[in-house]
């Protein structure tokens, strides 16, 4: 049964990933990371049907040497090293036809974007007896040669270098056309949107060429009006556990639990929608009263703000009056000190005065004392 799947994701150092580790896992080989000294050994992984490193123009390179070069080329600690594309291959095709389709698509990607494309074809996951007991209606196929049951998910991983590559393997600048952030700023389609359509056309052309009526559709279930629970990928750790033990991983159980919770929420949502329609009618009847309440609230708020503004203006006026009175009192005190100084100078120059002058001086001292008394009263 031909199914459509194409996804893209970055492999970056900020997530603790490496180009060497990703390439070793997809190809099922051993690669030593020269930058960190880590040995990525996936030679016992199994299920890798074919792997091939393709350079622009159809050239090739040593996988370990090339991806170590990519690691050395990117200096930043949060650098995106690889853009990975994962595709599902039509089960209707033969092994050689699937290989030709995946390798041809990887070669087209390398030439289109001027990057390296490391493609690896993986076999489908084995379906165990326990899984069939638990989910008897799940899709599975049986290999006529080996009798092995599998889920029919023939797929391929294509690692695209995040930088441009020359036909001789020389690394260049960042391949911005693979960066979704750059595509968004440039207002152009991102990598996934472009390649979903292209891969669908390429896979359908292969199905037609080999005489199969089945076709795939790159559109999502939602856009096609199909209500279906989307599939989830386990990832390398959980998939490895299932291969080694033959038991379902905890991650698979988590996915199933999440799916059941989403179905329960959807059912509850249907009930809520029916109830909400009744509430909408009640709210419509209350809308007139609500508008009046909002208008009254706004009127009271405006009244409070106006009273607050008046209070602040009165406070500023009182403060200005206090400052003016203080300035007047300070000036009066200064005038008094100046008069006392002048009188003291006169007395020093004329220690003996007549009766009339003495009377005038006494009157002046009396005025100064009275002025001081008024100043203290303020």
Swiss-Prot record:
Renumbered residue ranges of the record's region Disordered: 130-149, 212-253, 300-338, 358-378
Keyword annotations: Conjugation, Mobility protein, Plasmid
Short name of one Pfam family: MobA_MobL
Compositionally biased tracts (Basic and acidic residues): 130-146, 212-232, 241-253, 358-370
Chain ranges passing through the membrane: none
Family: Belongs to the MobA/MobL family.
Known role: This protein is essential to promote the specific transfer of the plasmid in the presence of conjugative plasmids.
Record-given protein name: Mobilization protein MobL
């Amino acid at each position: 049964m031909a199914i459509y799947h194409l996804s893209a994701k970055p492999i970056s150092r900020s997530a603790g990933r490496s180009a060497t580790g990703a390439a070793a896992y997809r190809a099922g080989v051993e690669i030593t990371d020269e930058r960190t000294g880590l040995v990525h050994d996936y030679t016992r992984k199994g299920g890798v049907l074919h792997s091939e490193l393709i350079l622009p123009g159809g050239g090739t390179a040593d996988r370990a040497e090339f991806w170590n070069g990519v690691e050395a080329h990117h200096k930043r600690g949060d650098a995106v090293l690889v853009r990975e594309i994962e595709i599902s291959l039509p089960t209707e095709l033969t092994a050689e036809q699937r290989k030709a389709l995946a390798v041809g698509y990887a070669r087209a990607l390398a030439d289109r974007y001027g990057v390296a494309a490391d493609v690896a074809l993986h076999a489908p996951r084995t379906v165990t007896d326990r899984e069939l007991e638990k989910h008897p209606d799940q899709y599975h196929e049986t290999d006529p040669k080996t009798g092995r049951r599998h889920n029919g998910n023939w797929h391929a991983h294509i690692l695209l270098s995040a930088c441009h590559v020359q036909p001789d393997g020389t690394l260049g600048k960042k391949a911005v056309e693979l960066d979704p952030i750059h595509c968004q700023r440039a207002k152009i389609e991102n990598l996934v949107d472009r390649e979903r359509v292209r891969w669908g056309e390429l896979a359908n052309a292969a199905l037609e060429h080999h005489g199969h009526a089945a076709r795939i559709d790159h559109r999502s279930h939602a856009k096609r009006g199909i209500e279906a629970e989307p599939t989830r990928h386990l990832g390398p750790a959980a998939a490895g556990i299932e291969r080694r033990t033959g038991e379902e991983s905890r991650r698979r159980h988590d996915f199933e639990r999440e799916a059941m919770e989403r179905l329960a929420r959807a059912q509850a949502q249907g009930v809520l929608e029916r109830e909400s329609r009744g509430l909408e009618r009640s709210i419509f009847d209350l809308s007139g009263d609500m508008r009046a309440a909002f208008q009254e609230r706004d009127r009271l708020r405006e009244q409070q703000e106006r009273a607050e503004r008046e209070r602040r203006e009165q406070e500023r006026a009182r403060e200005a009056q206090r400052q003016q009175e203080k300035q007047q009192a300070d000036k009066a005190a200064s005038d008094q000190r100046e008069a006392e100084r002048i009188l003291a100078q006169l007395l020093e120059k004329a220690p003996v005065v007549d009766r009339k002058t003495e009377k005038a001086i006494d009157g002046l001292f009396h005025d100064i004392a009275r002025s001081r008394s008024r100043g203290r009263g303020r």
